[in-house]
Amino acid sequence: MSVHVKEEPVLVPNCDVENTELAVFNGNGESELENFGTCVDEITDRVNQLEQKVVEVEHFYSTKDGAAQTNTSKSNSGGKKIAISQPNNSKGNSAGKEKSKGKHVSSPDLMRQFATMFRQIAQHKWAWPFLEPVDVKGLGLHDYYKVIEKPMDLGTIKKKMESSEYSNVREIYADVRLVFKNAMRYNEEKEDVYVMAESLLEKFEEKWLLIMPKLVEEEKKQVDEEAEKHANKQLTMEAAQAEMARDLSNELYEIDLQLEKLRESVVQRCRKLSTQEKKGLSAALGRLSPEDLSKALKMVSESNPSFPAGAPEVELDIDVQTDVTLWRLKVFVQEALKAANKSSGGTNAQNNNNTGTGEINKNNAKRRREISDAINKASIKRAKKA
């Protein structure tokens, strides 16, 4: 059945929701249309702002969950471990950098204990070759820098300790070992310097073992403190994000209420559909695609919860629907049919070449006919009443 849908005049609402006068404007309500448009624009701007906040909240929880999964996988792979970073001595002035990276900072007591140990090694009778930088030029050691990548001596270490360039004892330990390892690398085992370096390194390692328990205890304590600090910071962030999420939820709910109020105001200011328009709407519903028809029936069920929108067969009585529902259906049907007319040619050609899709279309067409028949029956009943 071919139905000509009459083009309707412009419907102009007033954003003042208290004004419930019903009216239809044939292009003469520009000011009220502008007023309504301003209301919608303001709500749209607010929704866009809230959308950005929603993205922030979603990003926070997505990254939080990802980090939690990563930590869980790490903990499941083995027992609890405490990572102790090796010192990086590539640059002399490293104290500030080490601290900024959150590495262990030895206590003053531990630093004093290590200084005593260092002084004992430096004052040993065999320590004299290692107290100053190697005189490469004076001794004619032309290949020294080819063999030794990073020269180090006890005198340089002492100066760095006095100027607080070390942040923890592990850094000093690494440099002291480097002094003796360099000597053992460059000199042959039979030479005196090699023997002296090997002996002092052994004594140094023995003394180092004496302070290890306290060092490990300090490092563990610092790791625990950092973990607690991080956990507290995370809890604070989560609380802030949770509060933001609640505020967003409340604001979005308020916007929904405003939109619903505006929609009701629009419909109240619009005239009622005529009998002829209702007949046209009934016929147009039967021409919708199954997907669009389901959407239309869902609109009916939103204002009438008892309406069985998902049932195999439905009987839709246009006369009992609210003005809000009728206008929503009218606008939706017009837009849906326009879109369907634009794409019907290509869609039909594709469906004819696909057997499986053709079978689905047959079933869909059957459902459209059933619903259309039900709507037409309702129209006949209404005509008889008239």
UniProtKB/Swiss-Prot annotation:
It is found in: Nucleus. PROSITE patterns: BROMODOMAIN_1 (PS00633), BROMODOMAIN_2 (PS50014), NET (PS51525). The keyword Electron transport does not apply. Barely detectable in stems, leaves, siliques, and dry seeds, but was present at considerable levels in roots, flowers and imbibited seeds. Residues 66-106, 340-386 are annotated as: Disordered. Residues 68-78 have a biased composition (Polar residues). Keywords: Activator, Bromodomain, Nucleus, Transcription, Transcription regulation. It holds the Pfam family Bromodomain. The keyword Transcription regulation applies. Residues 263-344 form the NET domain. The NET domain could serve as an interface to localize different proteins or complexes to chromatin. Transcription activator that plays a role in the promotion of seed germination by both negatively and positively regulating the abscisic acid (ABA) and phytochrome A (phyA) transduction pathways, respectively. This is Transcription factor GTE1.
